[in-house]
Amino acid sequence: MTDQKKLMAVCGHMDQVAGVRQMELQDGRAAGLRCAMIHNGPLELPLMLDKCLDPAWIRYKGINLSLLTKPGLQGRNPYDTAGDEAVRSIMGGAMFTCGLGNVHGNRVVDGVEYPVHGRMRTTPAEKISMDAFWENGEYKILVSGEMREAQIFGENLVLRRTLSLIHI
């Protein structure tokens, strides 16, 4: 547990130590991709707000602990879930959401097309919430959102995701 008074006596703002901030990437195929950039001491991870709140990477003490695929970071594309082209939008990351309708490769079953690893992985979050605050002597960082995979006369699947970190 962090001693709040001692910590605040030596730093001007808690963002020096830990926090979350919404950012937008601005170049290449990632242009326009929004993220909740979390830093917590030696830990850094951006949650991709436009890609199901998946963390694009996790770095600990500057060392990357995750995969970034050849296509690299990128925003939503017209081919994100279209047939074999879908593999061009898989950027990897520290966690990669599969599903919710399917988790296998691209195939057609009973006339229904299922894209590689499902549609949820490229679904932007709604009802996004970000906060960082002291509570009972602990500095907490929270990010949450809701993603929906739905069609008018079909499925209506909702994924609610919350990431919670405590600075120690």
Task: Annotate each predicted stretch with a short phrase.
Residues M1-S164:
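Surface-exposed acidic/polar loop and edge beta-strand patches at domain peripheries
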Residues I166-I168:
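Conserved small/polar residues in nucleotide/adenosyl-binding loops
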